[in-house]
């Protein structure tokens, strides 16, 4: 636990250091605000005082202070962003400290990914409140969240792919600063989750203005005519009123295009603000040395023709920000009259899109994938006692020592092992209510899933063969589908049989099969199902209250092993060790608990 304490200390130190930086940022904002006020008042006063003393005095005492005022506005904006950045940095480190104590309510739980018909995610509480996803999720981009969820929904089944992902996660787990920078940049974006999808749609949409030659002429022609008129007016060849009339005419002419440009800006202008976030995240990644196969490959995706991806994305961000100046009526009127500013900017934006149409979606996907890797890397960093399991090449193999459930308190969790070293092979677990059977099944399932997505697991040692995971732990009635509990369970078992008949390699975890029928029917069906699994050459774990299932070991002595979780009654008190033992359970606790609660139990 010493390493865990060091990690807690690291987060605390980051908070302390950042709080000092935040104090400094607030002081700078205060002094800049004060200086801006002084300069503005001074510039206005000097303009009034020196108005009649000519342009030289006016420039020296009024215009120059005003220029300095504008520069201070930019510095003010920088320090405001810096303040928000530092506040968010403190916040995410405080969140990590709470998460270390199993309070991870601050993180997105991915409830939109809950799927009752999924092969294992509902049974293992992968998504939703207090879920595995919520515990691990640190994504700060919508695409990153989608990537992370997809990895949980469809785990890897290839040894090399898992090992490559392990390398990437391990590499990022050693770089706390990079991970937090990526997260902070994403969290500071104030847009909506759908924006990235719409940006992709925009990137793939056809250009309108740039493809029409007649629309490309006005910006150049208007600029030439305007400056020619201004030059002729200065030389006295034409009157200033003619030059002014030409200018006004062009202002009116530019309004023809305003409706279409306004539609473009309304649809995409605010959404494209996220590009500055992606530009910063891309730049951060471009500057980072990558060692693992996956991260090197992702970094090569952040490329462009004649410039870096970060430069290209920042260029588009600047073009969109420049177009936003049209919201200032005075500036847009002057620029449209002089150089057809709005149309010129839209044509530049469409030119950018034509060059990078295929690049932008790829860059966004790449940053999203890195964002997802950072979540798993933070999970690895926060659990230094977790290990990366060995991935077996030959089917089927699952061995682990001291497995623990990641969501259980590390100081209270009783850890157990598992050993499946051949195919077919089933572990049958018996035991009393509340003795720990279901928790054990979920512990095995969750760690198996983590291993198959490349993440570290809570075990002293683990070796797995990555067959597809299928569970049936939490079947329920469906009123909407007019489906009984028993029929829902049968459908699940039929799904498993169909997959096995199709030749899929599965690792199956079942809890109390055929719960929706009478005892004799259930027992007969359970015997038949396990025998069918044996003949179909598959592997798994089954938990049951039916002690007679333990006799199957007599028929399959090399392929079935019995384990149990016992409830011990000592001094008229029920106790649980939660330690898995060999053999079939000997003690049951239902009648004992009923008596303790005052419910009459009639003995034969």
Can you describe what each PLM-predicted range is?
Residues 1-432, 439-469, 491-492:
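Alpha-helical coupling/stalk and coiled-coil linker elements that connect catalytic or binding modules
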Residues 72-73, 257, 376, 382-604:
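ATPase nucleotide-binding head domains, primarily ABC-like/P-loop NTPase cores
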């Amino acid at each position: 636990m010493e390493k865990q304490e060091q990690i807690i200390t690291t987060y605390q130190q980051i908070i302390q250091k950042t709080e000092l930086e935040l104090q400094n940022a607030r002081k700078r904002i205060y002094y800049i605000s004060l200086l801006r006020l002084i300069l503005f008042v001074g510039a206005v006063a000097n303009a009034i005082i020196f108005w009649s003393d000519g342009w030289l005095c006016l420039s020296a005492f009024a215009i120059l202070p005003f220029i300095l005022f504008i520069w201070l506005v930019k510095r003010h904006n920088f320090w405001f962003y810096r303040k928000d950045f530092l506040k968010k940095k403190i916040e995410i480190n405080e969140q990590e400290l709470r998460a270390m104590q199993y309070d991870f309510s601050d993180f997105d739980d991915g409830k939109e990914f809950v799927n009752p018909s999924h092969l294992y995610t509902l049974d293992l509480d992968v998504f939703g409140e207090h879920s595995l996803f919520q515990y691990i999720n640190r994504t700060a981009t919508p695409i990153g969240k989608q990537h992370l969820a997809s990895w949980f929904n469809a785990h890897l089944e290839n040894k090399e792919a898992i090992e490559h992902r392990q390398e990437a996660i391990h590499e990022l787990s050693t770089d706390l600063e990079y991970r937090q920078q990526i997260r902070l940049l994403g969290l500071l974006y104030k847009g909506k989750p759908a924006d990235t999808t719409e940006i992709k749609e925009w990137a793939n949409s056809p250009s309108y203005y740039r493809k029409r030659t007649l629309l490309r002429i006005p910006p150049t022609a208007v600029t030439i005519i305007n400056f020619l008129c201004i030059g002729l007016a200065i030389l006295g060849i034409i009157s200033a009123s003619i030059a002014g009339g030409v200018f006004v005419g062009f202002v009116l002419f530019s309004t023809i295009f305003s409706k279409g440009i306004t539609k473009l800006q309304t649809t995409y202008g605010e959404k494209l603000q996220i590009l500055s976030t992606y530009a910063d995240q891309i730049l951060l990644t471009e500057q980072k040395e990558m060692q693992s196969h996956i991260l090197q490959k992702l970094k090569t995706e952040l490329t462009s023709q004649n410039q870096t991806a970060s430069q290209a994305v920042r260029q588009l961000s600047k073009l969109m920000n420049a177009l936003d100046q049209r919201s200032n009526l005075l500036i847009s009127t002057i620029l449209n009259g002089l150089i057809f500013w709005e149309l010129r900017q839209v044509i530049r934006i469409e030119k950018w899109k034509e060059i990078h149409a295929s690049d932008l979606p790829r860059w966004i996907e790449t940053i999203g994938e890195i964002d997802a890797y950072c979540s798993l890397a933070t999970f690895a960093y926060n659990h230094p006692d977790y290990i990366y399991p060995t991935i077996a090449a030959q089917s089927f193999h699952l061995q682990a020592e001291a497995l623990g459930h990641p969501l259980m308190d590390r100081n209270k969790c009783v850890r157990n092992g598992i050993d499946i070293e051949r195919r077919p092979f089933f572990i049958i677990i018996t035991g009393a209510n509340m003795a720990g059977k279901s928790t054990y099944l979920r512990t095995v399932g969750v760690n198996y899933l983590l291993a198959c997505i490349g993440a570290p697991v809570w075990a002293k040692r683990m070796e797995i063969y990555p067959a597809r995971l299928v569970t049936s732990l939490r079947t329920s009635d469906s009123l909407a589908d007019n489906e009984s509990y028993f029929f829902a369970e049968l459908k699940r078992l039929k799904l498993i049989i169909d997959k096995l008949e199709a030749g899929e390699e599965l690792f199956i975890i079942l809890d109390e099969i055929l719960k929706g029928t009478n005892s004799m029917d259930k027992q007969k069906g359970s015997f038949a199902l396990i025998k069918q699994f044996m003949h179909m050459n598959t592997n798994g774990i089954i938990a049951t209250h039916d002690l007679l299932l333990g006799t199957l070991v007599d028929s399959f002595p090399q392929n079935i092993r019995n384990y149990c979780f016992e409830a011990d009654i000592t001094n008229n008190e029920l106790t649980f060790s939660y330690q898995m033992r060999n053999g079939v359970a000997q003690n049951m606790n239902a009648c004992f608990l009923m008596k303790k609660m005052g419910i009459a139990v009639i003995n034969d």
